[in-house]
Amino acid sequence: VAGPQLDDASMERACSLAGPTTTVVRTCPGLAHRIREAAAVISMGGYNTVCEILAADTPALIVPREVPRLEQTIRARALAGAHLIDTLSQADATPEALSRWLNGAVTTRTDRSRIARGGLAAAAHAAMTLIAPDNDGDLQ
């Protein structure tokens, strides 16, 4: 899944480099389900994709985009430090390194059950606490 922002020339190159059993697409409806069902995932470190990965027990290797911002690299390093994903820099993501990682990853699952996933409910509670009327009926 190349993503909707990949330019046409890069998409054509990716398609031409793909092997006979590989399909390159821009988008993939139902990606969360495919991540859950996959033996392993190699991905860039975009926010939405990483959230989908963290919701599954699929082993994941994140190869973060390093320019124009370090956002993905920072995210990948933090998650790797918590032993939730593996990460490689773009320079280290050679075919050999990717193959080595895949060979080990496809026989395992990653336990991410310790991740607190109640952020939406916690945010709603915090907002309600901040705007709840005080004893005089005034908003705090």
Write out the residue ranges for each language-model feature.
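Donor-nucleotide binding loops and adjacent catalytic segments primarily
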Residues: V1-A40, T73, A91-A93, A97
